[in-house]
Amino acid sequence: MIFRKLRKFLKSKLARYPAAFRIYEAISWTFTRSAFSPKHFFPTMAAILFPTWIAPRARLALHYVGEGKLDRAIAIAEDVLARKPEAYLDDDTFNRLAVAYHLEGRTEDLRQLYDNTEDRRSEIARELQYDRLALRFFPRAGFSSIGPLGLLDIYLKAQILGITPPRTNVILGARKEFANPAYLRYWEKYFSLVSHPPTIALLAPLSCYLEERSNQLWCGPRGMRNVAMIGRAAQLQWEAEGRGPLLELSNEHRERGYRLLREFGVPQDAWFVGLHVREASDRLNLRNADVGTYRLAVEEIAKRGGWVLRMGDDSMRPLPPWPNMIDYVHSGKREDWMDVFLWAEGRFFIGTGSGPQMIPPTFGKPVAIANYGPIATIVCGKDDILLPKPYWSKNEGRYLSLSERMQPNYAFNESIRAFAKFDVRVVDNTPDELRELVIEMINRLEGQHAETEEERATQAQFAALAATYQFYPVKIARVFMSKYPQSSQRHMASTFQESLLQHN
């Protein structure tokens, strides 16, 4: 952090001296991005001289992932696992190897990595009798981002419903280390927070064997289960029993939120929605979209008297003036509690396959989910609507059906690079499709949406598909069903069904 600030300071001062600035840039490139940079050079030498030294080799694999050299990253991951397949991998090492497999679309290898690691952790926990303590830890390393924080909803619902064993749930880390400290406070009603660094360090020998991951849940004798699978079971049962949301916006945040809306110019009686569009990230880039394509959707909301507040962070590109649109992330007034207010108090939320999409349902608010890729990973509820990205098969000259998207090559894949290997092009939703999604959400909320017989039949087919592959049967947007008919009932290879059922 100190060196980063120093570099930023020097860069600003040297900008007025072109010759000195070019020398600085050359030195900076050499020591930060070239093959001689410490982050690259030392792990590379360690990989050559000490091939059994796992930690630096895993760091090198992650470095290759960042450069888009996934083949090299995968080669390191496979060699590490081949040399020590029985070894317990710490979280950092595990995550570095897992990212490489995930981006390459190696779903089965990723699942095997999860299974082997969790089996080993469970074995050690039993040997040391840690499992008898009935504790469950949620470390900052795995749950600091906003999406994993939203998944606490699923973890808790599953425990309340008896799907997972009863545990005392402990979050490890200082509030300021999490993406949204104000949102974290809402969960402290149900979770204990340990924030004192020495205490966290003392707990480390215990907690490392009892930690949860943000995409796998421990279900007792049944072993590990994918969070989307547990999310389906928990949410369907929760809804069937008529239970309400776990979180409720505080009066203080509600009052402060509406006060700030007035400062933004939102009329007192106007309704509003939050909008978040993921952008500018190379990893998991299938989740990205162009916020500029949402203009027609925003105009539709404005036409109906609503306002839109664009959420995210100030690294996102600013928006031009749109009717009834507030570029909240560039307003200079962004606060963690205001983010919570927008998620919890908006009429609905417009999201993509990114973390903020997870939060409104924890307060009982619906989400219009657009530009979504791997449907098998969806975690949502009965009031949400999904507009997936279409998958175009170059070999067959047509769009893949929803059932075909459950095949191993596509089901959990979030890397456009990996799709290119299968000659499949992932297509972003069009401005017209995004507008139709918003219209459908508003009409549903106002009780003015009437499904056709064909839509009901298609939705029933999709629900059956979701039951087979154990993910939530979210409502598919009308515009997707009409524009990309899902009438063909192609089935998956029996080998994939068997492997999926064994995993379950």
Give the location of each predicted region.
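Structural register within alpha-helical repeat arrays
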Residues: 26-27, 60, 97
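Secretory-pathway glycan-assembly enzymes, especially type II membrane glycosyltransferases
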Residues: 103, 110, 119-252, 462-504
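Leloir-type glycosyltransferase catalytic cores
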Residues: 216-263, 382-504
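Catalytic donor nucleotide-activated moiety binding site of glycosyltransferases and closely related
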Residues: 270-271, 275-281, 291-336, 454-460
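A donor-sugar binding/catalytic signature common to diverse glycosyltransferases
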Residues: 339-385
